[in-house]
């Protein structure tokens, strides 16, 4: 019997979208529960460590976006062929998480003075550094982020790209031809194209 899936997350793409991409690619039906802000106080105590996204698999709760994505990648043939390739995938996904954290450090800063000071280093140093490096990695891997083939790392990156772009206030791959081609490649997959066409529209 096929497992049942229920994703619990707020009504945005962000860290829930890699999971939605992977479930769609795996042609799995899933309940996409998007709670509203007012629902969170009652929902939070039932979530592991009080955070989302949470993916229930046959009623069993799993959490942490990267861990869930890694699991789904294995389920759907998107992991490495050996430990070395899986290390390559994990390294690049962890680096994507570092990049996200650097942008989020600016975006979520509630102190406007502090936020202003972070803007120039982010735009002139951090973003160009990471996007150039990622572009070089994709070029060296034959058009992919790791292992020279399509893996869950590619889905993870493309799925959170709208979120990263929203926080950074720019299209991060616009001037990086290999990253841009990777985005088009993933979004062009029939299952992903179908998901993107039917998902609720959100900015991030």
From Swiss-Prot:
The lineage of its organism: Eukaryota, Metazoa, Ecdysozoa, Arthropoda, Hexapoda. GO terms for molecular function: glutathione transferase activity. Its EC number is 2.5.1.18. The keyword Transferase applies. This is Glutathione S-transferase. Residues 3-80 form the GST N-terminal domain. It holds the Pfam family GST_N. It catalyses: RX + glutathione = an S-substituted glutathione + a halide anion + H(+). Keywords: Allergen, Transferase. Belongs to the GST superfamily. Sigma family. The keyword Transferase applies. It comes from the Eukaryota. Residues 82-204 form the GST C-terminal domain. SUPFAM superfamilies: GST C-terminal domain-like (SSF47616), Thioredoxin-like (SSF52833). PROSITE patterns: GST_CTER, GST_NTER. InterPro entries: Glutathione-S-Trfase_C-like, Glutathione-S-Trfase_C_sf, Glutathione_S-Trfase, Glutathione_S-Trfase_N, GST_C, GST_superfamily, Thioredoxin-like_sf. Glutathione binds at residues 9, 40, 44, 50-52, 64-65. It comes from Blattella germanica (German cockroach). One of its GO terms (biological process) is glutathione metabolic process.
């Amino acid at each position: 019997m096929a497992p049942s899936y229920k994703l619990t997350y707020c009504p945005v793409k962000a860290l829930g979208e890699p999971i939605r991409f992977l479930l769609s690619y795996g042609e799995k039906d899933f309940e996409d529960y998007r709670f509203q802000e007012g629902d969170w106080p009652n929902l939070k105590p039932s979530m592991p460590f009080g955070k989302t996204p949470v993916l229930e698999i046959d009623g069993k709760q799993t959490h942490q976006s990267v861990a869930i994505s890694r699991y789904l990648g294995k389920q759907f043939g998107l992991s490495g062929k050996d430990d070395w390739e899986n290390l390559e995938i994990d390294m690049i996904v962890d680096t994507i998480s570092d990049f996200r954290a650097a942008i989020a450090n600016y975006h979520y800063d509630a102190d406007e003075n502090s936020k202003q000071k972070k803007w120039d280093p982010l735009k002139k140093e951090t973003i160009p550094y990471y996007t150039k490096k990622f572009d070089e990695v994709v070029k060296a891997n034959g058009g992919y982020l790791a292992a020279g083939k399509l893996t869950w790392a590619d889905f993870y990156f493309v799925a959170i790209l709208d979120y990263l772009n929203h926080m950074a206030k720019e299209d991060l791959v616009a001037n990086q031809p290999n990253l841009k081609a990777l985005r088009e490649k993933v979004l062009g997959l029939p299952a992903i194209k179908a998901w993107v066409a039917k998902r609720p529209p959100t900015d991030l």
